[in-house]
């Protein structure tokens, strides 16, 4: 248990007792998907929330708990009803499975830790989170984005080459991720890829292809007395050679009591690329580009992710940033 984990637990233990003693009875919650969550489940979820979550996310689920000061990224404000990693298309409510996965795994590279909580408590607190925003009473969760069969098995090198083009070129069934994230090829390479995919000659000699710009998001960092956002967070698209991805772990780590294999890593990458990132500039790519291109993109991004903190990755970064790129 690290120092922040210990501090959060201590703060919770110092404050949770009084809140539990005075906590009012809860009414059953009728959800937009037709289910009704029993009051007993919600009250159990509240107990779990107060014990594990309150110190960061606050009594009211607004992300303003006593431990939240100075945290980056800031704790999620559940009152907004927005979730980045919901396992569904952008803009839809997340599935219970996706919320539970985040609770069990945490978010890599953030103060959101993996919590070793019994499954019944995970289920209960997932339902309790739905009391913070009326969307849950009015809408159904989105359709889960399923991980399809990998069409590139046994052809990994070919997939990476295809994925490089899918990443860097926009149009013709390609995603053009380098428009928000940075490019990882030289300017001449990018011009050649663009000509190959689109048949168009484009001059990339001007402009900064290797610095990402922070993008607007829907996530509040300041609210007024009514809880309405007055300022929202800027989100920097990750540089895969430098930044940790929230729902993807380094190979060899143990995630949910199992070794994190290349296959598991690839599935997690596919899931977030396919679904997109809710409330941010990252769109849903499932259905927007051909499935074989979506998987090829996954393979290519995986190679970049695994170059992070390596000599080869640093050398690539230096080549891209050199004057003769």
Go through each PLM region and give its residues:
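Detector for the c-type heme attachment site
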Residues: 19, 56-63, 104-105, 113-117, ...
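C-terminal motif of bacterial Sec signal peptides marking the signal peptidase cleavage site
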Residues: 14-17
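Sequence/structural segment immediately N-terminal to covalent heme-attachment motifs in c-type
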Residues: 38-58, 153-183, 190-205, 269, ...
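Short pre-active-site segment immediately N-terminal to redox-active cysteine/selenocysteine motifs
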Residues: 49-55, 60, 74, 111, ...
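Short, solvent-exposed loop/turn and secondary-structure capping segments
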Residues: 58, 65-69, 90, 112-115, ...
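Extracytoplasmic electron-transfer domains, predominantly the class I c-type cytochrome c fold
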Residues: 70-116, 123-129, 194-284, 294-297, ...
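Bacterial N-terminal signal peptides that target proteins for export
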Residues: 1-7
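Electrostatic cytochrome c docking/interface patches
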Residues: 22-48, 137-172, 187-189, 308-317
């Amino acid at each position: 248990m690290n120092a922040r984990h210990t501090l959060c637990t201590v703060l919770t233990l110092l404050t949770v007792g009084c809140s539990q003693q005075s906590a009012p009875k809860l009414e059953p919650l009728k959800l937009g998907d037709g289910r009704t969550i029993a009051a007993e489940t919600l009250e159990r979820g509240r107990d779990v929330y107060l014990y594990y979550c309150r110190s960061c996310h606050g009594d009211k689920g607004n992300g303003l708990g006593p431990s939240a000061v100075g945290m980056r990224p800031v704790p999620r404000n559940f009152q907004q009803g927005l979730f980045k990693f919901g396992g569904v298309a952008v803009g839809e409510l997340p599935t219970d499975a996706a919320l539970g996965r985040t609770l069990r795994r945490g978010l890599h590279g953030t103060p959101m830790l993996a919590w070793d909580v019994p499954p019944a408590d995970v289920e209960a607190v997932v339902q309790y989170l739905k009391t913070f925003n009326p969307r849950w009473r009015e809408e159904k969760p989105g359709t889960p984005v399923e991980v399809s069969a990998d069409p590139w098995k046994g052809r990994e090198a070919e997939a990476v080459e295809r994925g490089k083009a899918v990443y860097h070129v926009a149009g013709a069934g390609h995603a053009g991720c380098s428009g928000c994230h940075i490019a990882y090829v030289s300017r001449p390479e990018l011009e050649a890829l663009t000509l190959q995919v689109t048949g168009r000659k484009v001059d990339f000699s001007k402009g900064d292809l290797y610095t990402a710009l922070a993008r607007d998001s829907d996530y509040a960092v300041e609210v007024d007395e009514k809880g309405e956002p007055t300022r929202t967070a800027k989100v920097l698209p990750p540089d895969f050679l430098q930044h940790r991805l929230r729902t993807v772990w380094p190979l060899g780590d143990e995630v949910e009591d199992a070794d994190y294999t290349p296959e598991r890593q690839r599935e997690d990458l596919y899931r977030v690329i396919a679904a997109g990132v809710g409330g941010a500039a990252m769109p849903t790519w499932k259905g927007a580009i051909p499935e074989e291109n979506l998987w090829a993109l996954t393979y290519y991004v995986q190679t970049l992710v695994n170059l992070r903190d390596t000599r080869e990755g640093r050398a690539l970064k230096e080549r891209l940033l050199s004057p003769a790129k």
